[in-house]
Amino acid sequence: EFNSSTLYRYATVAVHELYKQLQGETAEAVQGFVRAFICSMPTGKQNTFANRTLPDAVLVTLRKDQPINLAGAFERPVRAGKNNDEGYAAASAKAFANYVGEVYNDWLGKPELSLVTGRFFAEIPDAQTYPLKDLLNTLTKELHNRLGNGRDGQ
């Protein structure tokens, strides 16, 4: 029997602390971390299960208040759509997007910036959707601007 589960991964980077150490290289370091985090997978059974699957959706946010772990979106098991008209990936993304909206409305509000890659996160409030390369470039540019070391169009 083979099981393909929803895998929710979460990481946080204290950019303000990283900036104290790296100064002008902070944005590039964050970009490298985000790229590696998105494109890497746990290595257990990597040959048995060919786990080089890329994510179906990615959400990157910049917040000034506190990081938010959104794992609560999967407190209940996600089921494929009625009559199997949508798969687990779409149903998981829908549950996640709904939960994100609830958390933003009920608790801390929207982040300063939300960047999305993947076809499933269109419902996330105020998220800008990009292919991965453009998401990383936009993130880097935003960090340069917010850290006060903007680099004319880079």
Functional labels for PLM-detected ranges:
Residues 1-154:
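Basic polyanion-binding and macromolecular-assembly surfaces
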